[in-house]
Amino acid sequence: MVQAPSVYVCGFVERPDAPPKDACLHLDPLTVKSQLPLKKPLPLTVEHLPDAPVGSVFGLYQSRAGLFSAASITSGVFLSLLDSIYHDCDIAQSQRLPLPREPKLEALHAWLPSLSLASLHPDIPQTTADGGKLSFFDHVSICALGRRRGTTAVYGTDLAWVLKHFSDLEPSIAAQIENDANAAKRESGCPEDHPLPLTKLIAKAIDAGFLRNRVETLRQDRGVANIPAESYLKASDAPDLQKPDKALQSPPPASTDPDTMLSGNAGEGATACGGSAAAGQDLISVPRNTFMTLLQTNLDNKPPRQTPLPYAAPLPPFSHQAIATAPSYGPGAGAVAPAGGYFTSPGGYYAGPAGGDPGAFLAMDAHTYHPHPHPPPAYFGLPGLFGPPPPVPPYYGSHLRADYVPAPSRSNKRKRDPEEDEEGGGLFPGEDATLYRKDIAGLSKSVNELQHTLQALRRETLSYGHTGVGYCPQQGPCYTHPGPYGFQPHQSYEVPRYVPHPPPPPTSHQAAQAQPPPPGTQAPEAHCVAESTIPEAGAAGNSGPREDTNPQQPTTEGHHRGKKLVQASASGVAQSKEPTTPKAKSVSAHLKSIFCEELLNKRVA
């Protein structure tokens, strides 16, 4: 067991069971085997910064699980910086496992949890012009996120404790690493402390904050490396930043809340922001437009709320004794009763058993006013004869007593916000706007409407061809009248709708071609290709020569050394050095080209 004041860092720098997506990151097993063991230690840097060396890599080892790296951090300036970072970093101080407090180790696991190997690009020959050979391995860096999967770093002051976390590592290789570490400790003298470029380190930390799904990717790397949970790794922990002495205080503002700082990453947002509410459940991120569409669809599919029908009182019994003569119509038949009373019909009304004689019919003068507020009931079958008729329920539908049922309430439907990708306000630096989120259904509908309109105009134009106005032969030139009714150069059809006088006789070279159609046949449609030609390249807005977006790979020796290396750090400078693929054509230019092709196909047909 090796004890040293320095910090050891070990981990896989390449895993064959998780091949990278970029072809330049693949390592040839034969080439790797020819370069091992290392003839001299490799530099250990931070984020591939050449002016930020913090230690040395004393060995690279080929195991069954992949290429394994073992290094030590000996820079006193860097170790002192880690102590200062720990006291001001809440994520570094968060700990849920019963492990001893190690400020340096916890700060390293929170800041630089991955390893990145810088090797020679596979397209660059290892043999130089003077017959020398270039070193295939250049350096190893500790970084925020590696481009190869399974490259999780484990830090510790005890080398045996560090190697114990890699269950895929053979015991023989672990013993060889301990022997090489003892030999490197004896051979190395007093380490030199170089001043660190703090500005560059801060810039790299800012870049790492905008890596998409960084925490989720770190979880994946930890699973690929098969590292147990008994470590200082922060990738799978949702830190509890609630301190006991601040439990009764108000929550901090949003600008300094650590949960808010972690909400920029999709994976951390699911754990840190979800917190105890998620209770360990797996959460997924859904785009805002998709969520609003699902919510609105759920509201629209709800059945409408049925209102109960009002209770209708039973109608009074019909009696033939109440039948009387039809009311007479006179000048006062349309009088309006004042408020509080009613008018009786001209023939009287039925008094009922309360009046003495069950069949008594009280005769009243026409339109006699009665002060009591409730008129006598009108019997079924004779409305209006024995008092005012009952109010007729409003008719909605096919049933007389059908009530109005309101449509499903849409009060909770809110207006959609404008797309942030279209305005460019919701994009992080370095991200591209997803143009294909635009609604193409409206544009397709407009294209269909234009096609139907063009077909209608074509049919209408063909109908004018039988009226004797004339037509142009299929291969002949088009007739253009110079007057106000003449054919305009930007119209889509050749035959004018109205010609005030017959066209002039064709010239000698046209007379041989202009032949009238046979009887009973329809005149063919003329083609004016020169007047309505729509160049397909012009629709896309690219009139000049295109620039070459694929620069050639540097193969000469005169180029800079940095252009020959493949750096496997996600936030390093390697991404800016590699050639970028041309961006996809915009949606608007694509739709314009489709529309022009449709117009040309319709005209040829």
UniProtKB/Swiss-Prot annotation:
Region ranges (Disordered): 235-275, 403-432, 489-588
GO biological process: nuclear capsid assembly; proteolysis; viral release from host cell
GO molecular function: identical protein binding; serine-type endopeptidase activity
Motif (Nuclear localization signal): 410-416
Entry's Gene Ontology cellular component terms: host cell cytoplasm; host cell nucleus
Compositionally biased residues, Polar residues: 568-579
InterPro entries on file: Herpes_virus_sf, Peptidase_S21
Domain free text: Region of interaction between pPR and pAP is called Amino conserved domain (ACD). The region of interaction with major capsid protein is called carboxyl conserved domain (CCD).
Similarity remark: Belongs to the herpesviridae capsid scaffolding protein family.
Protein name according to UniProt: Capsid scaffolding protein
Organism field: Epstein-Barr virus (strain AG876)
